[in-house]
Amino acid sequence: MSCYRVEGGFPVSGCIRVCGNKNAALPCIAAAVLTQEPVLLQNVPDIEDVAVMLTIFRAFGGSVERRGNHEYMLHLPQLQTCEVPCEAAQKVRASILFAGPLLARGRKAVLPPPGGDVIGRRRLDTHFLALAALGAQVRLDGVFTFSANKLVGCDVFLDEASVTATENVLMASVLAEGVTVITNAASEPHVQDLCHLLNAMGARVSGIGSNVLTIEGVSALHGTTYTLGADFMEVGSLIGLAVVTRGALTISDVNVRDLRPLGFAFKKLGVIWSEQEHAVSVSASQDLRVNYDFGGMIPKIDDGPWPAFPPDLTSIMTVVATQVEGVILIHEKMFESRMFFVDKLITMGARIILCDPHRALVSGPSALHGSDLVSPDVRAGMAMVLAACCARGVSIIRNVYQIERGYERLVERLQAIGVRIWKEG
């Protein structure tokens, strides 16, 4: 099994380009099932989850042509099967995103339970109830089987603002009869990317960026070319890396509009950056002190549906907080197992009290030391990389497949900005 060897204590420096949004690439690959014509996706990150989604797309009879480093031409002129292969589905949670497109085009979808990160209970009921509202029959018997004679638009109220459920209903409803209104829809930048792609294919989606989406069904979609937005999760990770290593870093190809929720959270830790049109620069001279709430109350960083702070970055913020003077509460509201990785930080010397599965109280700054670590999921794995980079000595990080599911050519790109990291095994 491959692992990362990281020698900590060296500041990053230079410039790094942020990759395309992983969470936009996955539903956009699924959306290519909706048309018989070619769809060219640009700025697609070269990561494991994308590779798995492309494997599933090929299983339906589709062709995938790679054009350059980050461009893929997807073409599915004839849908040969509506079954998602089991082995691939169990590698990535986003395999559930093929339910909506397969229902819309083939009137059937058969999916094994999806895999992905083990970060807590991740219910699928919202998907089932929403697709059933459009007219699908749902059967659960070891696999998930969806079928429909036709899909008819309706008012769909999601019982939670689930990103993937919103995306599934979007893709199912663009070819449905009539009008669909999704209330309590997710509005993250990657959901907006999917909406813009669908409209470029001939769909009629309005309310993009809000929590109410209106979809007027059309008879067919056509091919298009679409460029995915920047991965703001990666931007947040790289900002955190610069902070914990006391480095100066410029991150390019950034959509600065997506960083507002991140800015409020980082400022609680004394972290600021400067913004250019498509870049952010982090200075090496940061006054890393917790900004306490009025009255001297301990502040907290908590997550929620967009535009709240994204849950995928709570692990990163936990590591950053270990290097900041003061006490702060990290409250992971959405996933009850995501904070369990902090026991590894504690073995490295971090002063963290895990209050319960959702909350960690972090006191800093802590002098971390190298350790032997195992990545439990993609975001905690990247957080461990940050911890290793600021720790004294050498750290070994295992199960790096989890990290590479979400971060493109991580070792090569981090080496280019001064991180002493090597992949072994």
From Swiss-Prot:
Keywords: Cell cycle, Cell division, Cell shape, Cell wall biogenesis/degradation, Cytoplasm, Peptidoglycan synthesis, Transferase. Phosphoenolpyruvate binds at residues 22-23. UDP-N-acetyl-alpha-D-glucosamine binds at residues 93, 312, 334. Pathway: Cell wall biogenesis; peptidoglycan biosynthesis. It is found in: Cytoplasm. CDD domains: UdpNAET. One of its GO terms (biological process) is cell division. InterPro entries: Enolpyruvate_Tfrase_dom, Enolpyruvate_Tfrase_sf, MurA_subfamily, RNA3'P_cycl/enolpyr_Trfase_a/b, UDP_GlcNAc_COvinyl_MurA. GO terms for cellular component: cytoplasm. It comes from the Bacteria. It holds the Pfam family EPSP_synthase. Its main location: cytoplasm. One of its GO terms (molecular function) is UDP-N-acetylglucosamine 1-carboxyvinyltransferase activity. Its EC number is 2.5.1.7. It catalyses: phosphoenolpyruvate + UDP-N-acetyl-alpha-D-glucosamine = UDP-N-acetyl-3-O-(1-carboxyvinyl)-alpha-D-glucosamine + phosphate. The active site is at residue 117. Belongs to the EPSP synthase family. MurA subfamily. Cell wall formation. Adds enolpyruvyl to UDP-N-acetylglucosamine. HAMAP family: MurA. This is UDP-N-acetylglucosamine 1-carboxyvinyltransferase.
